[in-house]
Regions:
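Conserved MFS/SLC helix-loop-helix module at the cytosolic interface between two early adjacent transmembrane helices
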Residues: 56-93
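Juxtamembrane intracellular "pre-TM" segments in multi-pass secondary transporters
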Residues: 1, 192-228, 425-427
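Multi-pass alpha-helical transporter architecture, strongest
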Residues: 6, 89-91, 181-193, 390-424, ...
Protein backbone atom coordinates (compact mmCIF):
# COMPACT_ATOMS: atom_id res chain seq x y z
CA UNK A 1 0.00 0.00 0.00
CA UNK A 2 1.45 3.37 -1.00
CA UNK A 3 2.30 6.05 1.54
CA UNK A 4 -0.33 8.40 0.13
CA UNK A 5 -3.07 5.79 0.45
CA UNK A 6 -2.05 5.06 4.06
CA UNK A 7 -2.10 8.76 4.87
CA UNK A 8 -5.50 9.13 3.17
CA UNK A 9 -6.91 6.39 5.41
CA UNK A 10 -5.41 8.21 8.40
CA UNK A 11 -7.22 11.43 7.46
CA UNK A 12 -10.48 9.59 6.83
CA UNK A 13 -10.45 7.95 10.27
CA UNK A 14 -9.31 11.16 11.97
CA UNK A 15 -12.43 13.06 10.99
CA UNK A 16 -14.79 10.07 11.05
CA UNK A 17 -14.20 9.75 14.81
CA UNK A 18 -15.12 13.39 15.39
CA UNK A 19 -17.92 13.70 12.85
CA UNK A 20 -19.85 10.64 13.97
CA UNK A 21 -20.98 12.30 17.21
CA UNK A 22 -20.19 16.03 17.15
CA UNK A 23 -23.06 17.07 14.86
CA UNK A 24 -25.73 15.11 16.70
CA UNK A 25 -24.41 15.38 20.28
CA UNK A 26 -26.69 18.35 20.98
CA UNK A 27 -29.76 16.32 20.02
CA UNK A 28 -28.73 13.53 22.41
CA UNK A 29 -28.08 15.98 25.25
CA UNK A 30 -31.38 17.81 24.70
CA UNK A 31 -33.23 14.51 25.13
CA UNK A 32 -31.08 13.26 28.00
CA UNK A 33 -31.64 16.43 30.04
CA UNK A 34 -35.14 17.23 28.80
CA UNK A 35 -37.01 19.41 31.27
CA UNK A 36 -33.96 20.23 33.39
CA UNK A 37 -33.22 23.82 34.35
CA UNK A 38 -30.33 25.34 32.39
CA UNK A 39 -30.49 22.75 29.59
CA UNK A 40 -29.08 25.21 27.05
CA UNK A 41 -26.09 25.92 29.26
CA UNK A 42 -25.51 22.18 29.64
CA UNK A 43 -25.36 21.84 25.84
CA UNK A 44 -23.19 24.94 25.44
CA UNK A 45 -20.79 23.83 28.16
CA UNK A 46 -20.49 20.38 26.59
CA UNK A 47 -19.52 21.86 23.23
CA UNK A 48 -17.13 24.26 24.98
CA UNK A 49 -14.99 21.27 25.99
CA UNK A 50 -13.70 21.11 22.42
CA UNK A 51 -12.69 24.77 22.40
CA UNK A 52 -11.06 24.59 25.84
CA UNK A 53 -9.01 21.66 24.60
CA UNK A 54 -8.05 23.58 21.44
CA UNK A 55 -6.31 26.16 23.64
CA UNK A 56 -4.00 23.49 25.09
CA UNK A 57 -3.44 21.46 21.91
CA UNK A 58 -0.38 23.42 20.71
CA UNK A 59 1.44 22.63 23.96
CA UNK A 60 0.89 18.89 23.58
CA UNK A 61 2.01 18.84 19.95
CA UNK A 62 4.82 21.33 20.40
CA UNK A 63 6.37 19.51 23.35
CA UNK A 64 5.61 15.80 22.95
CA UNK A 65 5.35 15.53 19.17
CA UNK A 66 8.18 17.87 18.28
CA UNK A 67 10.66 16.85 20.96
CA UNK A 68 9.99 13.53 22.73
CA UNK A 69 8.40 10.82 20.58
CA UNK A 70 7.40 9.81 17.06
CA UNK A 71 4.23 11.56 15.97
CA UNK A 72 2.53 8.40 14.69
CA UNK A 73 3.09 6.71 18.07
CA UNK A 74 1.74 9.74 19.96
CA UNK A 75 -1.26 9.82 17.62
CA UNK A 76 -1.96 6.14 18.30
CA UNK A 77 -1.75 6.50 22.06
CA UNK A 78 -4.01 9.53 22.15
CA UNK A 79 -6.69 7.83 20.05
CA UNK A 80 -6.60 4.66 22.14
CA UNK A 81 -7.11 6.79 25.26
CA UNK A 82 -9.84 8.68 23.42
CA UNK A 83 -11.64 5.45 22.58
CA UNK A 84 -11.95 4.55 26.25
CA UNK A 85 -13.12 8.04 27.16
CA UNK A 86 -15.79 8.08 24.43
CA UNK A 87 -17.18 4.76 25.63
CA UNK A 88 -17.25 6.16 29.15
CA UNK A 89 -19.20 9.21 27.94
CA UNK A 90 -21.83 6.86 26.48
CA UNK A 91 -22.52 5.48 29.97
CA UNK A 92 -22.89 8.82 31.80
CA UNK A 93 -26.11 10.60 32.69
CA UNK A 94 -24.78 13.39 34.94
CA UNK A 95 -24.08 16.67 33.14
CA UNK A 96 -21.03 17.50 35.24
CA UNK A 97 -19.45 14.11 34.63
CA UNK A 98 -20.20 14.36 30.91
CA UNK A 99 -18.47 17.76 30.82
CA UNK A 100 -15.28 16.45 32.41
CA UNK A 101 -15.26 13.24 30.38
CA UNK A 102 -15.70 15.17 27.12
CA UNK A 103 -13.03 17.67 28.15
CA UNK A 104 -10.58 14.86 28.83
CA UNK A 105 -11.41 13.25 25.50
CA UNK A 106 -10.88 16.46 23.55
CA UNK A 107 -7.59 17.12 25.35
CA UNK A 108 -6.54 13.83 23.77
CA UNK A 109 -8.19 14.45 20.40
CA UNK A 110 -7.48 18.08 19.50
CA UNK A 111 -3.67 17.72 19.39
CA UNK A 112 -4.08 14.93 16.83
CA UNK A 113 -5.53 17.41 14.32
CA UNK A 114 -2.08 18.99 14.12
CA UNK A 115 -0.31 15.63 14.35
CA UNK A 116 -1.94 14.21 11.21
CA UNK A 117 -0.89 17.31 9.28
CA UNK A 118 2.72 17.09 10.37
CA UNK A 119 2.80 13.32 9.78
CA UNK A 120 1.69 14.05 6.23
CA UNK A 121 4.21 16.87 5.78
CA UNK A 122 7.06 14.59 6.83
CA UNK A 123 6.12 11.80 4.45
CA UNK A 124 5.19 13.39 1.12
CA UNK A 125 7.54 14.71 -1.53
CA UNK A 126 5.56 17.77 -2.57
CA UNK A 127 3.48 19.30 0.21
CA UNK A 128 1.73 21.89 -1.96
CA UNK A 129 0.38 19.40 -4.49
CA UNK A 130 -0.07 16.27 -2.36
CA UNK A 131 -1.33 17.56 0.99
CA UNK A 132 -4.66 19.03 -0.28
CA UNK A 133 -5.51 15.71 -1.96
CA UNK A 134 -4.74 13.74 1.19
CA UNK A 135 -6.54 16.26 3.42
CA UNK A 136 -9.68 15.91 1.27
CA UNK A 137 -10.12 12.42 2.72
CA UNK A 138 -10.71 14.04 6.10
CA UNK A 139 -13.74 15.88 4.77
CA UNK A 140 -14.94 12.66 3.16
CA UNK A 141 -14.52 10.93 6.52
CA UNK A 142 -16.71 13.56 8.19
CA UNK A 143 -19.38 13.14 5.50
CA UNK A 144 -19.37 9.34 5.77
CA UNK A 145 -19.60 9.64 9.58
CA UNK A 146 -22.81 11.66 9.25
CA UNK A 147 -24.31 9.19 6.78
CA UNK A 148 -23.29 6.27 9.01
CA UNK A 149 -24.85 7.50 12.24
CA UNK A 150 -27.98 8.65 10.39
CA UNK A 151 -28.11 5.35 8.47
CA UNK A 152 -29.27 7.37 5.48
CA UNK A 153 -27.65 8.43 2.19
CA UNK A 154 -27.94 12.21 2.38
CA UNK A 155 -31.57 11.76 3.43
CA UNK A 156 -32.45 10.32 0.01
CA UNK A 157 -32.82 6.69 1.07
CA UNK A 158 -32.08 4.44 4.05
CA UNK A 159 -28.58 3.09 4.53
CA UNK A 160 -28.75 0.52 7.38
CA UNK A 161 -25.05 -0.14 8.03
CA UNK A 162 -25.05 -0.25 11.85
CA UNK A 163 -26.49 -3.64 12.86
CA UNK A 164 -28.49 -3.54 16.06
CA UNK A 165 -28.45 0.25 16.32
CA UNK A 166 -31.48 2.45 15.70
CA UNK A 167 -31.67 6.23 16.03
CA UNK A 168 -27.93 6.39 16.63
CA UNK A 169 -27.84 10.16 16.34
CA UNK A 170 -30.28 10.62 19.22
CA UNK A 171 -28.80 8.02 21.59
CA UNK A 172 -25.50 7.26 23.29
CA UNK A 173 -24.74 4.80 20.49
CA UNK A 174 -23.05 7.65 18.60
CA UNK A 175 -20.30 7.75 21.22
CA UNK A 176 -19.91 3.97 21.11
CA UNK A 177 -19.50 4.00 17.33
CA UNK A 178 -16.95 6.80 17.68
CA UNK A 179 -15.14 4.83 20.41
CA UNK A 180 -14.83 1.71 18.22
CA UNK A 181 -13.58 3.80 15.30
CA UNK A 182 -11.09 5.58 17.56
CA UNK A 183 -9.73 2.26 18.85
CA UNK A 184 -9.28 0.92 15.30
CA UNK A 185 -7.63 4.17 14.30
CA UNK A 186 -5.36 4.10 17.36
CA UNK A 187 -3.93 0.70 16.46
CA UNK A 188 -3.71 1.66 12.78
CA UNK A 189 -1.63 4.73 13.69
CA UNK A 190 1.27 2.53 14.80
CA UNK A 191 1.54 1.25 11.21
CA UNK A 192 1.89 4.74 9.71
CA UNK A 193 5.19 5.92 8.19
CA UNK A 194 7.76 6.95 10.77
CA UNK A 195 7.57 10.62 11.74
CA UNK A 196 10.31 11.25 14.33
CA UNK A 197 10.41 14.41 16.49
CA UNK A 198 12.12 17.18 14.51
CA UNK A 199 12.85 19.47 17.46
CA UNK A 200 14.50 16.90 19.73
CA UNK A 201 17.15 18.53 21.89
CA UNK A 202 16.01 22.07 21.13
CA UNK A 203 14.88 24.38 23.95
CA UNK A 204 11.14 24.72 24.54
CA UNK A 205 9.76 28.19 23.73
CA UNK A 206 6.18 28.39 25.03
CA UNK A 207 5.57 31.75 23.36
CA UNK A 208 6.55 30.35 19.97
CA UNK A 209 4.54 27.14 20.41
CA UNK A 210 1.38 29.16 21.13
CA UNK A 211 2.09 31.50 18.25
CA UNK A 212 2.48 34.54 20.51
CA UNK A 213 5.73 35.55 18.84
CA UNK A 214 3.57 36.51 15.86
CA UNK A 215 1.81 39.20 17.92
CA UNK A 216 4.17 41.68 16.25
CA UNK A 217 1.94 41.29 13.16
CA UNK A 218 -0.62 43.36 15.07
CA UNK A 219 1.52 46.40 14.31
CA UNK A 220 -0.09 46.20 10.88
CA UNK A 221 -3.44 48.01 11.42
CA UNK A 222 -5.20 45.93 8.75
CA UNK A 223 -4.03 42.66 10.25
CA UNK A 224 -5.10 43.83 13.70
CA UNK A 225 -8.59 44.46 12.33
CA UNK A 226 -8.59 41.02 10.70
CA UNK A 227 -7.50 39.32 13.94
CA UNK A 228 -10.09 41.10 16.10
CA UNK A 229 -12.91 40.47 13.61
CA UNK A 230 -11.86 36.81 13.27
CA UNK A 231 -12.26 36.43 17.03
CA UNK A 232 -15.61 38.24 17.05
CA UNK A 233 -17.16 36.38 14.09
CA UNK A 234 -16.40 33.05 15.76
CA UNK A 235 -18.73 33.92 18.63
CA UNK A 236 -21.85 33.52 16.43
CA UNK A 237 -20.03 30.74 14.54
CA UNK A 238 -20.30 28.56 17.64
CA UNK A 239 -24.10 28.65 17.37
CA UNK A 240 -23.94 26.65 14.15
CA UNK A 241 -21.69 23.85 15.33
CA UNK A 242 -23.39 23.41 18.69
CA UNK A 243 -27.08 23.91 17.89
CA UNK A 244 -27.86 23.42 14.20
CA UNK A 245 -27.94 19.63 14.41
CA UNK A 246 -30.57 19.53 17.14
CA UNK A 247 -32.50 22.43 15.56
CA UNK A 248 -32.86 20.86 12.10
CA UNK A 249 -33.38 17.44 13.66
CA UNK A 250 -36.29 18.63 15.79
CA UNK A 251 -37.82 20.72 13.01
CA UNK A 252 -37.45 18.41 10.01
CA UNK A 253 -34.96 15.55 9.83
CA UNK A 254 -35.12 13.50 13.03
CA UNK A 255 -32.89 10.43 12.93
CA UNK A 256 -31.60 11.41 9.48
CA UNK A 257 -30.07 14.68 10.71
CA UNK A 258 -26.46 13.59 10.27
CA UNK A 259 -27.14 12.68 6.65
CA UNK A 260 -28.73 16.03 5.83
CA UNK A 261 -26.03 17.96 7.68
CA UNK A 262 -23.44 16.18 5.53
CA UNK A 263 -24.62 18.30 2.61
CA UNK A 264 -22.78 21.16 4.31
CA UNK A 265 -19.45 19.35 3.81
CA UNK A 266 -20.37 18.57 0.21
CA UNK A 267 -20.90 22.30 -0.25
CA UNK A 268 -17.55 22.92 1.40
CA UNK A 269 -15.75 20.74 -1.14
CA UNK A 270 -17.54 22.50 -4.02
CA UNK A 271 -16.75 26.03 -2.86
CA UNK A 272 -13.19 25.07 -1.91
CA UNK A 273 -12.55 24.49 -5.61
CA UNK A 274 -14.01 27.92 -6.40
CA UNK A 275 -12.00 29.91 -3.85
CA UNK A 276 -9.04 30.60 -6.20
CA UNK A 277 -11.47 31.75 -8.93
CA UNK A 278 -13.31 34.19 -6.66
CA UNK A 279 -10.23 35.36 -4.79
CA UNK A 280 -8.49 36.59 -7.93
CA UNK A 281 -11.63 38.55 -8.86
CA UNK A 282 -12.87 39.84 -5.51
CA UNK A 283 -9.70 40.20 -3.47
CA UNK A 284 -9.16 39.45 0.21
CA UNK A 285 -11.46 42.08 1.74
CA UNK A 286 -14.54 41.21 -0.30
CA UNK A 287 -13.98 37.47 0.15
CA UNK A 288 -13.79 37.81 3.93
CA UNK A 289 -16.82 40.10 3.95
CA UNK A 290 -18.90 37.66 1.87
CA UNK A 291 -17.97 34.87 4.28
CA UNK A 292 -19.06 36.93 7.31
CA UNK A 293 -22.35 38.02 5.72
CA UNK A 294 -23.08 34.41 4.74
CA UNK A 295 -23.18 33.53 8.45
CA UNK A 296 -25.68 36.32 9.05
CA UNK A 297 -27.84 35.15 6.13
CA UNK A 298 -27.80 31.54 7.31
CA UNK A 299 -28.96 32.44 10.81
CA UNK A 300 -31.60 34.81 9.44
CA UNK A 301 -33.02 31.97 7.34
CA UNK A 302 -33.08 29.66 10.36
CA UNK A 303 -34.77 32.30 12.52
CA UNK A 304 -37.31 33.70 10.09
CA UNK A 305 -38.41 30.52 8.29
CA UNK A 306 -37.63 27.57 10.58
CA UNK A 307 -40.61 25.50 9.41
CA UNK A 308 -39.63 25.71 5.72
CA UNK A 309 -37.47 22.66 4.98
CA UNK A 310 -36.13 24.05 1.69
CA UNK A 311 -35.00 27.27 3.38
CA UNK A 312 -33.33 25.32 6.19
CA UNK A 313 -31.49 23.26 3.58
CA UNK A 314 -30.27 26.47 1.92
CA UNK A 315 -28.87 27.47 5.30
CA UNK A 316 -26.99 24.17 5.54
CA UNK A 317 -25.70 24.45 1.96
CA UNK A 318 -24.34 27.92 2.74
CA UNK A 319 -21.66 26.18 4.80
CA UNK A 320 -19.25 26.16 1.87
CA UNK A 321 -19.43 29.95 1.52
CA UNK A 322 -19.42 30.53 5.28
CA UNK A 323 -16.37 28.38 5.91
CA UNK A 324 -14.28 28.56 2.75
CA UNK A 325 -14.67 32.25 1.96
CA UNK A 326 -13.75 33.33 5.48
CA UNK A 327 -11.42 30.73 6.96
CA UNK A 328 -9.53 29.64 3.86
CA UNK A 329 -9.12 33.24 2.70
CA UNK A 330 -8.03 34.20 6.21
CA UNK A 331 -5.40 31.45 6.23
CA UNK A 332 -4.10 32.65 2.89
CA UNK A 333 -4.06 36.29 3.99
CA UNK A 334 -2.13 35.36 7.12
CA UNK A 335 0.37 33.39 5.06
CA UNK A 336 0.89 36.41 2.76
CA UNK A 337 1.31 38.94 5.57
CA UNK A 338 3.54 36.93 7.92
CA UNK A 339 7.29 36.75 7.34
CA UNK A 340 8.47 33.30 6.28
CA UNK A 341 10.00 32.49 9.65
CA UNK A 342 6.74 33.38 11.41
CA UNK A 343 4.11 31.73 9.22
CA UNK A 344 3.58 28.65 11.39
CA UNK A 345 3.23 30.64 14.61
CA UNK A 346 0.93 33.15 12.87
CA UNK A 347 -1.42 30.34 11.79
CA UNK A 348 -1.32 28.98 15.35
CA UNK A 349 -2.31 32.38 16.71
CA UNK A 350 -5.25 32.64 14.28
CA UNK A 351 -6.34 29.17 15.41
CA UNK A 352 -6.28 30.27 19.04
CA UNK A 353 -8.29 33.40 18.27
CA UNK A 354 -10.95 31.56 16.22
CA UNK A 355 -11.39 27.87 17.07
CA UNK A 356 -10.09 28.53 20.57
CA UNK A 357 -11.08 31.86 22.13
CA UNK A 358 -13.85 32.95 19.73
CA UNK A 359 -15.80 29.71 19.72
CA UNK A 360 -15.19 29.23 23.44
CA UNK A 361 -16.92 32.53 24.19
CA UNK A 362 -19.62 31.63 21.65
CA UNK A 363 -20.42 28.31 23.32
CA UNK A 364 -21.03 30.04 26.64
CA UNK A 365 -23.01 32.84 25.01
CA UNK A 366 -25.32 30.40 23.19
CA UNK A 367 -26.04 28.55 26.40
CA UNK A 368 -26.78 31.77 28.27
CA UNK A 369 -28.90 33.14 25.42
CA UNK A 370 -30.94 29.95 25.05
CA UNK A 371 -31.83 29.89 28.73
CA UNK A 372 -32.47 33.66 28.78
CA UNK A 373 -35.19 33.36 26.13
CA UNK A 374 -36.58 30.15 27.64
CA UNK A 375 -35.75 27.96 24.64
CA UNK A 376 -36.92 24.35 24.95
CA UNK A 377 -34.61 22.46 22.54
CA UNK A 378 -36.08 19.05 23.27
CA UNK A 379 -39.22 19.46 21.14
CA UNK A 380 -40.25 20.78 17.74
CA UNK A 381 -42.74 23.11 19.39
CA UNK A 382 -40.00 24.54 21.60
CA UNK A 383 -37.77 25.28 18.63
CA UNK A 384 -40.64 26.68 16.58
CA UNK A 385 -41.48 29.09 19.38
CA UNK A 386 -37.91 30.13 20.15
CA UNK A 387 -36.14 29.89 16.78
CA UNK A 388 -36.63 33.54 15.80
CA UNK A 389 -35.15 34.99 18.97
CA UNK A 390 -32.42 32.36 19.21
CA UNK A 391 -31.07 32.63 15.65
CA UNK A 392 -31.58 36.33 14.94
CA UNK A 393 -29.25 37.28 17.79
CA UNK A 394 -26.14 35.66 16.19
CA UNK A 395 -27.35 36.93 12.79
CA UNK A 396 -27.37 40.49 14.09
CA UNK A 397 -24.01 39.99 15.79
CA UNK A 398 -22.48 38.78 12.52
CA UNK A 399 -23.87 41.82 10.68
CA UNK A 400 -22.32 44.18 13.24
CA UNK A 401 -18.93 42.48 12.91
CA UNK A 402 -19.22 42.65 9.12
CA UNK A 403 -19.90 46.40 9.24
CA UNK A 404 -16.94 46.97 11.55
CA UNK A 405 -14.72 44.96 9.22
CA UNK A 406 -15.98 46.77 6.11
CA UNK A 407 -15.32 50.20 7.61
CA UNK A 408 -11.92 49.51 9.17
CA UNK A 409 -10.11 46.87 7.09
CA UNK A 410 -8.07 47.93 4.09
CA UNK A 411 -4.81 46.43 2.94
CA UNK A 412 -4.07 47.45 -0.64
CA UNK A 413 -0.83 45.49 -0.72
CA UNK A 414 -2.46 42.15 0.07
CA UNK A 415 -5.97 42.74 -1.31
CA UNK A 416 -4.85 42.35 -4.89
CA UNK A 417 -7.30 40.68 -7.26
CA UNK A 418 -4.53 39.37 -9.45
CA UNK A 419 -2.13 37.96 -6.87
CA UNK A 420 -0.94 34.37 -6.88
CA UNK A 421 -3.50 32.29 -5.03
CA UNK A 422 -1.43 29.14 -4.84
CA UNK A 423 -2.52 25.95 -3.13
CA UNK A 424 -5.03 26.32 -0.33
CA UNK A 425 -5.78 24.11 2.59
CA UNK A 426 -8.53 24.16 5.18
CA UNK A 427 -9.58 22.32 8.32
CA UNK A 428 -13.31 21.46 8.29
CA UNK A 429 -12.99 20.08 11.67
CA UNK A 430 -15.58 21.49 13.28
CA UNK A 431 -17.32 21.14 9.80
Amino acid sequence: MSVKVRLGIMMFLQFFVWGVFFVTMGTYLSQLFKGEEGINKIIGNSYATQTWAALFAPLVVGFLGDRLMNKEHLNGLLHLLGAGLLWWVSTLTDSTMIFWALLTFFICYMPTLALVNTITFQNVDNIETEFPKIRLWGTIGWIVAGLTIAESFFGLFELPILPGIESGGTTSAQFQVAAVASAIYGFYSFTLPASPPEGKGKPVDIMQILGFDSLKLMRNPSYLVFAVCSFLICIPLAFYYARTGEFVGAMHFGDRTGAYMAWGQVSEIFFMALVPFFLTRLGVKKMLLVGMLAWALRYALFGLMPSNMAVVMVGILLHGVCYDFFFVTGQLYTDRVAPKEMRTSAQALVGLLTYGAGMLVGNYVLGWWGDSIGLDPSTKEGWLEGAEKFWLMPAGFAVVVSVIFFLTFWDKKHDSKTGDVGELEADPAVS
